Amino acid sequence: MLWPAALVAMFALAARAREIDNVTCSVVYGSNVARISKDYWLAQEGSLVSFMTFENDDPVYFFMGRALGTGASGGKYLYRVTRDNNTNVSHVQTSLFIPEHFNGGILLDMGSNYTHDAETDPEFLNARYLVVNDTEDSVREETLGPCPEMLRTLDVSGRTTLLYPSRYLHARDRMQVEKTMDTAKCVSTSVNLDATVVFSVDFPFSERAILRVTQTFYPDDRPQKHLLYLASQGGKTVHYSEVSATVTPLPGGNASFNVTIEFTDQPDDTTIHLWVSPKGINDDPDAVSAYYILNSLSSYDDPYAHEEISCDSVYQNIVMVLGSVVNITSPDPLPRAPDYSYPTDDPAGETTESAVTWLEATAQTADEATTPLAAHATDGYEPTTAAATLSTTEDLTQETSTPTVTTVIDPTSGAVTTESRTTEGTAANVATTEAAGTEGQNQEATTAGGPTNAATTLGHQTIEAATVEDSTTTARAAEYPTPTTTTVEPRPAGGTTIEDPTDSPAIEDTTTPTTTAAKVTALKTAAAEGPTPCVTTYTGSDTEAAQSATSISDAVTPEDLTPETTTPVDWSVTSTYISVADGTSMPAPTPSAVAHEASTTPAPTATAVPTSHTPKPQESTSTPSRAPTTGVAPVTANSLSPAATSSERIVILNTATASSGPGASTGATTAPISPPWSASPAGDGVTTSAARTLEPSSTRKAVAAESTTAADDVATSELGSGDYGDHATEPPRIVITNPPGITTLHDADAAEEDPWPTRPLYSVNIVNATLTANGMLTATCMAAAKAKHAITFTWHVGSNMVPAITGPPEPGLMFNGNRAWSSRLQTVEYGISPSARLACMACTVPPAQRYCAHDVAVVARHDRLELDMQVDVATVSVVCSGLDGVESEPYFVWTANGRPVPLGSVRTKRIPNDYGTPARWQSAIHISRFFVPAGHRDVYECTATLASGETIKATKNWSNTDYLALQKNAAARSTFVVAGGITAFAVAELL
């Protein structure tokens, strides 16, 4: 049996320790409602017991405790330790309910006889690889032969892993954290540790309460964490061998006692975290009683300062402590106390706001703008992203080389060529460029390989990949030795031409050196001369509209890493009406123009890639077998959204500027401010969104400007010729972009200093949007926010505000310490328009300062006998729905990755609609996995057979980029590689 490559690679990231020969490795299969149990018999009482799980290459949960004698039975705790009175040995029973998101996770069980030496060298008992499969009716475990080498050379104590503090808290700890914020007592104490200090606090404590003490210190500004003490029973004194700390509970009444922590000769700049739960290990979680921070500063004048603080201010610290009680050696600096204050443009903190009002408020002039876009340098980025970890000037100025990819379309033949050349950049630029590669054209255009690519794919940046000296620059450049040119299938005549501002036929590099060494020398010389603007202009063929989309960015140099001033940037866009009836297109009127403020902080070179377009993973296709699809395929919300949309993108509103191409306008047109969704469809055409996006420059992310064409996004049918002025053979380019937008910016300095996420609202996405033939419009708006924030939603259909009739939004799925909120829209769209334009704005509510983000979508009217497939996050299912008005129950057959899904796993029901519209049919199966390894894709197919014998089929692709669109955080940007996550219906393919 072969182990997945991702699993072996994950273990390669762990620190090496001595080889342990007696490791047992197994694969556990079970459903997410089953429980894993395993017994271990340890040699004597007091043996050390440890437990760790991995998810997405992160330590999800780590527990290190001691056999405490006879333990209470029952409960939901992961471990139960009991005593066999006859043999006088400790019996450890692991008991774990299988969470679905642990699919592909690793459980490491270990224990040892308790001696002073053996405590730091526990015996590795078992490694278990989890496979969550709903078709399993019980838990079964298959023991493997010899374990992989990496498994046998792990540091089993987990104390020296090169992994970041986990963002994936176990449900027990997560619930306690959420309940902490309103009930806990948080205290900060500063002391001078030049001498012995006794630190005493009082807090409620029951006999079976949990007391956890961790220490964080910062050698070379890199935090390391140690578990000092963990007790689950009062009245005992426990010494931990490797640290000079003693925790002594002293009787102090029925409901409380005094904890004394004594430190001697501790390293300077040390933080002690003391976290208390009022209930025992076998009780359901209730609330955190107290959280104490002890800061040791050798230069502190006052020998003792005790201050009660807001728990909100240390929320991330609490999360870090609970999620990483192992020894963590971070490859990059992390802050100790993130600031959770959010600037706002709305001091009153109202809970609702018109989208138009917001857009007017944020359209500042250059003189008024004081908050540069660079404020998003680290917003929402967990430390596993390169942009977050390489946050200091020292890291960002490390020299590396990265390939720049340019795609050129020949205006005559329509042939597409992709040229890759090596340019100078930063380490963060290299890492984030490769991490941002998505399935489709961008991923194909990005040159693969290199140590940074490998590290970023796994969600980690090794020190070797992040720290690149001058001597290694040539070696890294050698990985991309010469420019490569790839010619893809020519497009029909009338393609789009990429031109530079001087009307040159194509972007060419006539000065590229012929050798790698010469290239490196030339690039260093060019970098020393300062940033050079790179302007790529898309030119359409309509003389009157003369619309073009211009992407402007500067090359990044170390001297230009700090945002200073802001200047207005004009963007030009192209919109086209597409006739659903016959597939013809015509240019849309010139869109309204708005000058939006953008930071002058140079962004990485952004090269336009507007040509070959692969259908995005989220696209859902429905093909009735009764007749071939004709005309233009329906444009769905999913097909209009970028494959990996990011709420970090700032919406640059409609701006018409002069273009240097043929038939260009000679001036810019400015119109009153309007939201990107304000234009209503005209006639029988679909108005494409005229919004462009500008990536925040200081995220150091090289962004490929997205562009699609009618042949790509509307289907393979040909467009009509139409009348396009002097260029009748070239239909105008069609831009279809629906990026979400951030409405509130943060202070740039605070963002640069805090690579931990400081944004309460990560993303807003419109999903599952449908418009039936009878006008029933439904959609769901998903917003991912930090768990302590509540969210309100505002819906717009066209330019009208529409309330969500299903009631207030309800919180939903928890992931990565965040909560997914959702609001459902259900209304009737009158008229015969073939599409509807939706907008959803989500805002945090008081007492937190308000923070808003929005998403827009265009949904096409469905034929009544079509099927639409969506992924339902709340139920973790793939849902196939449609067949409006069909009376007899259809027969649904499902396949996952080409393999049939058992009929017992298919759920089919009839969904009645309101407003007198016909009922719909819905069939669903449980999704086999949320996390899909990079380069893989799960394909679900739903086939409905009607009573007449007619069959209708729909397919849905699910990949890591689809999950990225939902999650929007660091782990998502690391392409969500799970250690060989296994599809429920295709286990044999990966094992």
From Swiss-Prot:
Composition bias type Low complexity, residue spans: 400-413, 472-493, 556-569, 598-615, 668-682
Chain spans, region Disordered: 332-352, 392-425, 469-511, 542-569, 587-641, 658-734
Transmembrane region(s): none
Keywords assigned by UniProt, alphabetized: Signal
Record's compositionally biased regions (Polar residues): 414-425, 542-554, 617-628, 658-667, 686-710
Disulfide topology: none
Signal peptide: 1-17
UniProt organism field: Psittacid herpesvirus 1 (isolate Amazon parrot/-/97-0001/1997) (PsHV-1)
Name by which UniProt lists this protein: Uncharacterized protein sORF2
